Amino acid sequence: MQTLQTTSLRVSENQLFILDQQALPQETRWLAADNVALLVDHIHTLRVRGAPLIGLSASLLLALLAQRGLNRDALQQALETLRAARPTAVNLMNNLDRMKQALAREDYPQALEAEALRLVEEDKQLCARIAEAGSALVKPGSRLLTHCNTGGLATAGVGTALGVIALAHRQGKVTNVWVDETRPLLQGGRLTAWELGELGVPYQLIADSMAASLMAQGQVDAVWVGADRIAANGDVANKIGTYSLAVLAHYHQIPFYVAAPQTTLDRYCPNGAAIPIEQRAAAEVTGVAGSFGAVQWAPTGAAVYNPAFDVTPAGLISGWVLDSGVVTPAQVAAGAFAPDNG
């Protein structure tokens, strides 16, 4: 396969490497992901994360395995194992559905490579179109709040919500970005803060619990988040804490936007209640660990509830910013995300 490089993925000498997102920002460390078990482990441990990036990494690995001579049955088994790696992120399923079609072809090694590379290029283009559509909604002098990480680390391109923010800043419309630390794994504090710093976008890091106070003081002009899955009725599954922000924004009459590619749409999922929510290990809440070290602050044996995602009802969302443009609440209510409109 040809050499390929994005912010978080690299293909070199027919091997897949991922940027270890658990090591950032203290270390920039690339890890091999050249077999299914290894990539699944990287996904489970969030060394590779972000709904678009997970789907792309799985697709690239399948293509590389085919280049190494794995037969169709072995590739099908690999595909199903990868498909189960992150149940909430629908981009993974959508990408692998396309790879499955390529696998059915007579020339499947070449077809898988072509499809994987096509998915990467499409994601770059989708991100650019999302940024263009979303930046038009950002008013001059805006102070924006974002949650988790939705930039180039999570995609092959400029990102989704963070791509919007970055472009709006280049257009001179963003004066400050409030970055939720995003407990329990601190994707905002570790990753979004790092990306915004690299891009030269002014930001201030806040604890998640500070968002309400900022909104009450009139310090937030809009909230921008990404999505791991969008249901047919417009409900959105995203990083835990997103729903809280949507409720707060609604109360304070602040626009709340979701930015995502159409690959995040699940037109056959009727509503948020049907979205599977991944439950994660207690250790993520009882303490913290990373390249910066590890500490446990809760009592040993403390009972923990740790869902990775929550669901924001469509009624709290001001607009869904897709690569096809901005979708309004009225359009969603009229069936814009329904199966027969796909």
From Swiss-Prot:
<feature type="binding site">
    <location>
        <position position="86"/>
    </location>
    <ligand>
        <name>substrate</name>
    </ligand>
</feature>
<feature type="site" description="Transition state stabilizer">
    <location>
        <position position="148"/>
    </location>
</feature>
<keyword id="KW-0028">Amino-acid biosynthesis</keyword>
<keyword id="KW-0413">Isomerase</keyword>
<dbReference type="GO" id="GO:0046523">
    <property type="term" value="F:S-methyl-5-thioribose-1-phosphate isomerase activity"/>
</dbReference>
<dbReference type="InterPro" id="IPR027363">
    <property type="entry name" value="M1Pi_N"/>
</dbReference>
<feature type="binding site">
    <location>
        <begin position="49"/>
        <end position="51"/>
    </location>
    <ligand>
        <name>substrate</name>
    </ligand>
</feature>
<keyword id="KW-0486">Methionine biosynthesis</keyword>
<dbReference type="Pfam" id="PF01008">
    <property type="entry name" value="IF-2B"/>
</dbReference>
<dbReference type="InterPro" id="IPR037171">
    <property type="entry name" value="NagB/RpiA_transferase-like"/>
</dbReference>
<dbReference type="GO" id="GO:0019509">
    <property type="term" value="P:L-methionine salvage from methylthioadenosine"/>
</dbReference>
<comment type="function">
    <text>Catalyzes the interconversion of methylthioribose-1-phosphate (MTR-1-P) into methylthioribulose-1-phosphate (MTRu-1-P).</text>
</comment>
<feature type="binding site">
    <location>
        <position position="187"/>
    </location>
    <ligand>
        <name>substrate</name>
    </ligand>
</feature>
<dbReference type="InterPro" id="IPR011559">
    <property type="entry name" value="Initiation_fac_2B_a/b/d"/>
</dbReference>
<comment type="pathway">
    <text>Amino-acid biosynthesis; L-methionine biosynthesis via salvage pathway; L-methionine from S-methyl-5-thio-alpha-D-ribose 1-phosphate: step 1/6.</text>
</comment>
<feature type="binding site">
    <location>
        <begin position="238"/>
        <end position="239"/>
    </location>
    <ligand>
        <name>substrate</name>
    </ligand>
</feature>
<protein>
    <recommendedName>
        <fullName>Methylthioribose-1-phosphate isomerase</fullName>
        <ecNumber>5.3.1.23</ecNumber>
    </recommendedName>
</protein>
<dbReference type="InterPro" id="IPR042529">
    <property type="entry name" value="IF_2B-like_C"/>
</dbReference>
<comment type="similarity">
    <text>Belongs to the eIF-2B alpha/beta/delta subunits family. MtnA subfamily.</text>
</comment>
<dbReference type="InterPro" id="IPR000649">
    <property type="entry name" value="IF-2B-related"/>
</dbReference>
<dbReference type="InterPro" id="IPR005251">
    <property type="entry name" value="IF-M1Pi"/>
</dbReference>
<feature type="active site" description="Proton donor">
    <location>
        <position position="228"/>
    </location>
</feature>
